[in-house]
Amino acid sequence: TIANFELFYRQSKSSCYYAEVFFPAIAETRREKIFRPRVEQLIKLCEEKAINVKRLFDVGAGFGIFLEEWRKCFPQAQLLAIEPSAPLARECRSKSLEVVEETVENVVGRDNSADLVTCFEVLEHVYDPLAFLQVLRRLVRPGGYVLVSTLCIDGFDLQVLWDKSNQISPPHHINFLPVEGFKKLFQRAGLINVEVTTPGRLDVDIVRNACKSDPELLQGQRFLNNLLEDDSSATALQNFLVEQRKSSHAWVIGQKK
């Protein structure tokens, strides 16, 4: 049930470890490697779509680093962090962010108000993806947008590693949709002008590292092994995956009517 999911992400040992030990140790590295590039990428997307973001809600805001980096670029923007974890919500408040310490399903008084709702690496965790997206849509003003990043089962590393992938890790990661599945899901949630991209950059490295840990992982796959061993070929392969929407890291954006 949703109640059990809420309890798990608030109180489970693994969730507490992530919030209190794991993430603090890598927060600043992720700021440089992930969150700043994410903000730059989103700014470019907003410019392409002429989205004027005066009010932005981030669902599953975590440490608040994304919103903090966004504020550096747009200091006048109204920002809201929606985060159910008490330690992570505290961290967001320490960054002077407005915080709602709830799962998004329990947020009240915020309907039809955001120009953009972002939700990074959360959809793969949720109990009911359709109901979850419908809640995100509810928060957006008419004409506003919902942007989700999540895992895509069409992605190279998931397809190659499959059950040996570290990304397939219930009860944490339980939802894996293909590109076409994301389109249909967003449309069923009442969103229009849905676009899916896979801008991931780690698929090839993930498979290469997995092969280093288990040299027999791609036994008999001579062509693929040769491709992965050559740096220039590996780089070209990753670029191809992005262009063809075959990376496991997906961005999905849709607009509210």
Residues covered by each model-derived region:
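A structural micro-motif
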Residues: 77, 97, 144-145, 191-192
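Conserved N-terminal segment of class I S-adenosyl-L-methionine
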Residues: 1-120, 130-133, 198-199, 211, ...
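Feature marks short, surface-exposed loop/turn motifs that line or immediately flank catalytic pockets
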Residues: 154-156, 200-203
